[in-house]
Amino acid sequence: MAVTINTELDPVFLKALGYLHSKSKDSAEKLKALLDESLCKGNDSVYRPQPKEMEQPKAMLSKVKPETKASSSTPSSSMLSKPLTSEKLKKEAEKRSADKMKVEISDVMDIPKKPRIEKTEARSSPVTVQLSKDLPVPDLSSFDETSADDFAMEMGLACVVCRQMTVFSGNQLVECQECHNLYHQDCHKPQVTDKDVNDPRLVWYCARCTRQMKRMAQKNQKPSQKPSPSAVSAVTPVAKDPSVNKPELKAKPDSANTFLAFKRAEVKASSAVSSSSSNSGVSSSSASGLTGWAAFGAKTANAVPVLGKLGTSSQATSGKPPSLSSVQKTGAAPGLAPSKPGSVSKSGSGGSSSSSTIPIKPLPPLILGKTGLSRSMSSDNVSKTGLPSPNPSSAGSVSSLSSQLGSNNGSSSAAGSNVTSSNKVAVDPSMQLSGAKGPTSQESQLNAMKRLQMVKKKAAQKKLKK
């Protein structure tokens, strides 16, 4: 096929094609020179007319020649009209040939721009190429511009108003931060100033978005203002409600009561510890857990009514005024446990005729460091003397009393706690007399403890005031 195509092609066209594909710098000049030569010669480079078409102009020319000869020989009017028609025919033939040459030149110029496959098709079927040339070609420049504008609008790169992307020094594109539309400074109403454009801190909104934002703000403010009076009215009765205020008023007395209750509990605990320690024979100072001068003062203060009770109970059981020695012994009461049953039996069986004589050891003097022990012993004496004996007239009341003491430890401890907790019992005048005759060391100790208690009370009152 390639060989047959080459035989059909014109050598001038092949030479022009070689110049077109050559990489030399002079190829363009040679191609232009070849084109000029082909135009001068009138040879067809691409399209060869068919023999029928060639014969038609020859026949027309041959007809015209005899007509011109005849016109020159015959000077008639009819013969004069023939040369005019022949001249018209000549002009038309020249015009046709000129049009054909123009079409051929345009084909030569357009073929290199097309790919090689199209070149082969154009060579094999030149009629189709001519038909394609006759079709109206659309304006590509206008199409490109419209498609670019549409693309810019779709991408949001052009102004919404004028639909253009042109940017000048005083007419730049500004983007709205809400709707993200672009506006030219001049297209937007009101116009955007250069300060707004150049300020990087500015968040710019278009006129439409600013209106919408103002409407939304007004709508939000109206419902927020309406429920405010109702909220105030709902709050006011809660503040005036007495049920709410009552617990607040009671809060302060509660705190005071809790403090006073704490003090009372401390006193009760100390008395209970002292009574239990008297039953178990262990000193209350080690069992109570209260250390320091406060615990020491509480114990000695409670020891005063114990002595008064002891004196009155011993006087009531015996029916005689107590002797000085017995009062001193019971008032001091720091002795050991074996000496207690003897003293109890003496006081219980004083009214009977038979008297049991039990040798009593002399009691040791009062020691300042063992005040807890003396208090426990005195409470023991009170509980034992306060218990009713089953047979007061019999001499064997000691054994029954001891059995009762073994079985009624709970009652004796309760009685001891009651005696120690009551601070309002007045001291017997006979007891005061016996105390005056007693040793001065005990009185001085009691006075010192009273002073210490007063100091403690004053300190506690100052703390409460603060």
Swiss-Prot record:
Indicate, by first and last residue, each region the UniProt record lists as having compositional bias (Low complexity). Answer: 69-84, 338-373, 392-423
As for family, the record states: Belongs to the Integrator subunit 12 family.
Name this protein carries in UniProt: Integrator complex subunit 12
Tell me where in or outside the cell this protein is found. Nucleus
- Feature: compositional bias, Basic and acidic residues: 85-101
- Where does the record place Basic residues bias? 453-466
- Give residue spans, biased composition: Polar residues: 218-233, 311-329, 374-386
In the UniProt record, which is one GO cellular component term?
INTAC complex
Q: Which InterPro entries match?
A: Int12_PHD, Integrator_subunit_12, Zinc_finger_PHD-type_CS, Znf_FYVE_PHD, Znf_PHD, Znf_PHD-finger, Znf_RING/FYVE/PHD
How is the subunit organization of this protein annotated in UniProt? Answer: Component of the Integrator complex, composed of core subunits INTS1, INTS2, INTS3, INTS4, INTS5, INTS6, INTS7, INTS8, INTS9/RC74, INTS10, INTS11/CPSF3L, INTS12, INTS13, INTS14 and INTS15. The core complex associates with protein phosphatase 2A subunits PPP2CA and PPP2R1A, to form the Integrator-PP2A (INTAC) complex.
A GO molecular function assigned to this protein is:
zinc ion binding
Enumerate the PROSITE patterns for this protein: ZF_PHD_1 (PS01359), ZF_PHD_2 (PS50016)
Q: Where is this region: Disordered?
A: 41-101, 216-251, 311-466
Identify one Pfam family in the record: PHD
- Which species does this protein come from? Xenopus tropicalis (Western clawed frog)
User: Source organism's superkingdom?
Assistant: Eukaryota
GO BP of this protein: RNA polymerase II transcription initiation surveillance
List keywords of the entry alphabetically: Metal-binding, Nucleus, Zinc, Zinc-finger
Zinc finger regions (PHD-type), where? 156-212
Disulphide connectivity of cysteines: none
Its taxonomic placement starts with: Eukaryota, Metazoa, Chordata, Craniata, Vertebrata
